[in-house]
From Swiss-Prot:
Role this protein plays: Mediates the regulatory switch from transcription to RNA replication. Acts late in infection by inhibiting viral transcription and up-regulating RNA replication. Inhibition of transcription by protein M2-2 requires phosphorylation of the phosphoprotein.
A Gene Ontology cellular-component term: host cell cytoplasm
Keyword field contains Cytoplasm: no
Superkingdom of the source species: Viruses
Subcellular location: Host cytoplasm
Entry keyword set: Host cytoplasm, Viral RNA replication
Protein name according to UniProt: Protein M2-2
Keyword Coiled coil: no
Family listed: Belongs to the orthopneumovirus M2-2 protein family.
InterPro entries: Pneumo_M2-2
Membrane-spanning segments: none
Length: 90
């Protein structure tokens, strides 16, 4: 099994996350500022930000963004290659 495809639009760094769009053949889910992007408080492996800090307040580098999105997807149970993940940044 391979991981989902992750696309970052536009591809610029440092950046802040505006929205995360998760798509598959039968499902589309969007995370944005309205339904604030909080990461799992119980994830002790991520030391880049405090557990309750929103994604859009962080100025990401390329590798930090990819690593954190992969952790976020695993937290959501999205680990199959049937998904495409679009990360909209500003």
């Amino acid at each position: 099994m391979t991981m989902p495809k992750i696309m970052i639009l536009p591809d610029k760094y440092p950046c802040s996350i505006t929205s995360i769009l998760i798509t598959s053949r039968c499902r589309v889910t969007m995370y944005n500022q309205k339904n604030t992007l909080y990461f799992n408080q119980n994830n002790p492996n991520n030391h880049m930000y405090s557990p309750n800090q929103t994604f859009n307040e962080i100025h990401w580098t390329s590798q930090e963004l990819i690593d954190t999105i992969q952790n976020f997807l695993q937290h959501l149970g999205i680990i199959e290659d049937i998904y495409t993940i679009y990360i909209l940044v500003s």
